[in-house]
């Protein structure tokens, strides 16, 4: 029964029924009013207020939990769940690392936290500005955490907020309902330490690479590095910053020598040396081939049409992102001295 739709009656039919059963007009009105409010209450109880089911989580190490997302672009089928997210539990509180692509996913992540621990969420850390990592932030507002990100995060989010929201609503429709950008309340410039209670986390910002606001989280206790999108596994790396800077950052990440790695996209806790080397090889060949195209006097379109064609079968989402990567690399390297 639709509560938003009126129901037609024959003229005088309610009066006739009332007379048949001897019901007074006043009692009849009260009875219909009670039934109406009862139906409204029922609709509210069984309606869209139901809690999101918790995200599935994988324990990477004691106290470290991550969700393996879909290797895809955001669609209604995957509900925008396309970036790995998770949380770290200390003795005092919890740090959430990235929150997913919608408010609904953020709520599901919060439910997953509550399945594991009753401890409060004291930090929500965003590894960078991209929408698949940040739109779940609003699910944690009532926990009153510090929202933590690079010192460059707020400006980067503000510059694209309108476009991100428009694209989210276009691709996901009502699945995206309530999603909004919640910016940082605490920023990191260089490095910072957060303590969850017997669990120090080292946060570090990087030079422009995947974006200009990349941030990693290293858990000293378990040796787990959350790379954000500085590491893509199986999915093609996406250049929204600097291919040169990214290659330099990869060299520094290797020197950290973590025991476990949670990448921004792809399988959790992969053989990280092999994964970084595959990403490094792609980016190095991209930069080298684009430099050669520029040296030959090729236009940007000619470079897009010819560079990196041999990479097609090596990476998921190649057809969507590789040509964009060539364009970004050309624009960066064209003015290289």
For every predicted segment, state its role.
Residues 61-112, 215-227:
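Conserved beta-strand hairpin/beta-sheet module of binuclear metal-dependent hydrolase folds
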Residues 247-298, 302, 306:
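Divalent-metal (often Zn2+) His-rich catalytic cores of metallo-beta-lactamase-fold enzymes
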């Amino acid at each position: 029964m639709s509560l938003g739709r009126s129901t037609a009656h024959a003229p005088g039919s309610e009066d006739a029924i009332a007379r048949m059963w001897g019901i007074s007009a006043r009692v009849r009105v009260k009875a219909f009013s009670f039934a109406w409010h009862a139906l409204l209450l029922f609709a509210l109880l069984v309606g869209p207020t139901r809690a999101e089911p918790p995200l599935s989580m994988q324990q990477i190490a004691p106290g470290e939990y991550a969700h393996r997302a879909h290797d895809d672009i955001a669609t209604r089928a995957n509900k925008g769940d396309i970036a790995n997210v998770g949380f770290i539990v200390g003795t005092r509180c919890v740090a959430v690392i990235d929150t997913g692509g919608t408010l609904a996913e953020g709520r599901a992540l919060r439910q997953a936290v509550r399945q594991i621990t009753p401890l409060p969420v004291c930090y929500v850390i965003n590894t960078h500005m991209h929408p698949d990592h940040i739109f779940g932030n609003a699910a944690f507002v009532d926990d009153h955490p510090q929202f933590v990100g690079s010192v460059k995060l707020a400006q980067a989010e503000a510059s694209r907020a309108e476009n991100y929201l428009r694209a989210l609503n276009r691709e996901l429709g009502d699945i995206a309902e309530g999603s909004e950008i919640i910016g940082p309340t605490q920023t990191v410039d260089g490095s910072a330490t957060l303590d969850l209670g017997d669990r120090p986390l080292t946060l570090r910002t990087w030079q422009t690479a995947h974006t200009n606001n990349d941030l990693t989280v290293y858990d000293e206790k378990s040796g787990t590095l959350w790379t954000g999108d500085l590491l893509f596994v199986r999915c093609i790396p996406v250049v929204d910053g600097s291919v040169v800077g990214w290659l330099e950052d990869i060299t520094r990440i290797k020197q950290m020598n973590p025991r476990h790695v949670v990448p921004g996209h792809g399988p959790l806790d992969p053989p990280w040396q092999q994964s970084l080397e595959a990403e490094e090889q792609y980016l190095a060949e991209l930069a080298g081939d684009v430099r050669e195209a520029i040296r030959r006097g090729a236009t940007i379109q000619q470079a897009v049409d010819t560079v990196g064609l041999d990479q097609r079968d090596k990476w998921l989402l190649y057809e969507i992102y590789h040509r964009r990567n060539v364009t970004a690399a050309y624009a960066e390297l064209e003015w290289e001295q």
